[in-house]
Amino acid sequence: RQMCIRDSHSRFSAPSEEECLGHINSRLSESSDFLRKATRLVITLGTAFVYRLKSDGRIVSNCHKLPEKMFDRQRLSTQEIVEDWKPLLLALWEQNPALKILFTVSPIRHWKDGAHENQLSKATLLLATDALQKDYPGRIAYFPAYEILMDELRDYRFYADDMLHPSPVSYTHLTLPTT
């Protein structure tokens, strides 16, 4: 039986809770060291939908194949996203005041709830990143990966066979310069 923690990615599973927590803590330490030295951080938001644990209302990062009945799925509001990100951003800048953050919205389509809900989710993320950029001018920037793929590269050759993910050709257009 594999042990896992609901607030972690599924790759952090182990035969015992102690071993699982050891892997998680080791990775947290490495990530913390990296972020203290980084000059830039790119954050890509994929969807405004989250899963909340019914027992306590907590948002979980991974359902770990637990029964669906244990969770409520909801789309966060723009304000909820902004308010959730502010403490994290302030904590990052407390550790690394020079850190510049670049937000993007993933062009990968989430069709689970249909095209309309996907667009509402992406619009929510776009409004949230815009609000954060306005709240922290000079510290947060936005790269329009979503807009480039949806508007400039809307030809189907820029999509993979599943018509949801970008094709390898589109990545050449979406890659940031390395300066």
Residue ranges and their predicted role:
Residues 2, 6-34:
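Basic, amphipathic N-terminal segments that precede the first structured/catalytic domain
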Residues 1-7, 172-178:
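Conserved small/polar residues in nucleotide/adenosyl-binding loops
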Residues 24-42, 87-94:
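Short amphipathic alpha-helices and their capping/turn segments at secondary-structure boundaries
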Residues 90-119, 152:
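Active-site segments of SGNH/GDSL-like serine hydrolases
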Residues 45-56:
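Short, solvent-exposed beta-strand-terminating loops
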Residues 100-102, 123-155:
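Extracellular serine-dependent O-acyl
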